[in-house]
């Protein structure tokens, strides 16, 4: 190794440490990793059936008619930030104004409806205006992709002392194919205008990687303990639920805030199919394997054994 190359590597190592974002596990050197694979998602153009609209509209009306009394709690704080009433009314009126409803759910990445549990760490407006936020979002994603690849034993575990230049030589698209395509795992169908990695004909986000890892660990626990159901408290948009269903079949129940459970119902029905999801206001049928309920229904749950309770994707 030439002296100049040694000096360059040592300088890169020092700079990587100085500029390291400690939310990342792996060191990235100042050399820019290509950004051409990253962009704002704009390709979700799902056909929404009348059955879908009737089902989600009825659930929204159920939530509106059964909302609990306002208290000085987290839900009250979120309600002041998120325009929940307008969202709820739009979904309730979806049968009358189908175009407005479809426009909202396909492009809600521009809205603040997912405040606190969204796909990105920053809002669309912040990411669009500032390159530094997009760069951080990119590094968070690649950092977790490397960790997930290490978990699957696709690559050796990187030692931070090795520096960022080793990481930059990884073929990220190849790793993505090894994890998703070869395992026949389909990405979660989230809304447009989130910032992520362009993969095949879809997009992947940090929440996809985290949801898949959580699903793998849940699968291990579920099978090793002969359990009968998974219950998630605060399930966000449903990333973990979606990936659990990609890995194995089980009864999966989610409890969450009203507007969050409504959003989860929408995107899980798009991702998993309308008949796979049972909403609280409906009768159960044999096809239902995902159950979505508002948080106050948790006190009606009488099950005591063979259930895995967990919390992963919430505040």
Protein language model features and the residues they cover:
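Conserved SAM-binding loop of SAM-dependent methyltransferases across substrates and taxa
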Residues: 237-248
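A short SAM/SAH-binding and catalytic strip from SAM-dependent methyltransferases
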Residues: 307-315
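S-adenosyl-L-methionine
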Residues: 267-303
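Carboxylate/His-rich catalytic cores and anion/metal-binding grooves
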Residues: 263-264
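Conserved class I S-adenosyl-L-methionine
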Residues: 226-236
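Membrane-proximal basic amphipathic "stem/tether" segments
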Residues: 1-77
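Conserved SAM-binding motif I beta-strand of class I
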Residues: 251-257
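Conserved Class I S-adenosyl-L-methionine-dependent methyltransferase catalytic core
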Residues: 82-225
């Amino acid at each position: 190794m030439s002296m100049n190359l040694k000096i360059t590597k040592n300088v890169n190592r020092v700079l990587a440490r100085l500029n390291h974002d400690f939310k990342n596990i792996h060191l990235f050197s100042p050399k820019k990793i290509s950004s051409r694979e990253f962009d704002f998602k704009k390709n979700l153009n799902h056909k929404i059936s009348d059955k879908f609209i009737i089902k989600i509209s009825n659930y929204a009306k159920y939530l509106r008619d059964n909302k609990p009394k306002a208290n000085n709690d987290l839900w009250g704080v979120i309600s002041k930030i998120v325009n929940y009433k307008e969202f709820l009314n739009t979904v309730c009126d979806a049968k009358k104004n189908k175009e407005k409803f479809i426009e909202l759910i396909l492009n809600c990445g521009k809205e603040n409806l997912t405040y606190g549990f969204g796909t990105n760490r920053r809002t669309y407006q912040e990411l669009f205006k500032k390159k530094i936020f997009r760069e951080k979002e990119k590094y968070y994603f690649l950092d977790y992709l490397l960790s997930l690849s290490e978990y699957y034993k696709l690559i050796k575990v990187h030692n931070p002392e090795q520096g960022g230049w080793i990481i930059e030589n990884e073929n990220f698209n190849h790793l993505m194919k090894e994890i998703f395509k070869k395992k026949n795992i389909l990405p979660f169908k989230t809304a447009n205008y989130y910032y992520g990695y362009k993969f095949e004909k879809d997009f992947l986000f940090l929440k996809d990687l985290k949801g898949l890892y959580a699903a793998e660990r849940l699968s291990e626990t579920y099978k090793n303990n002969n359990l009968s159901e998974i219950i998630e408290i605060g399930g966000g948009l449903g990333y973990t639920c979606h990936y659990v269903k990609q890995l194995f079949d089980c009864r999966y129940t989610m409890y969450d805030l009203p507007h969050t459970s409504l959003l989860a119902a929408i995107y899980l029905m798009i991702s998993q199919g309308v008949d796979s999801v049972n909403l609280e206001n409906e009768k159960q049928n044999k096809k239902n394997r995902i159950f979505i309920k508002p948080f106050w229904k948790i006190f009606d749950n009488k099950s005591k054994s063979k259930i895995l309770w967990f919390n992963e994707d919430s505040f």
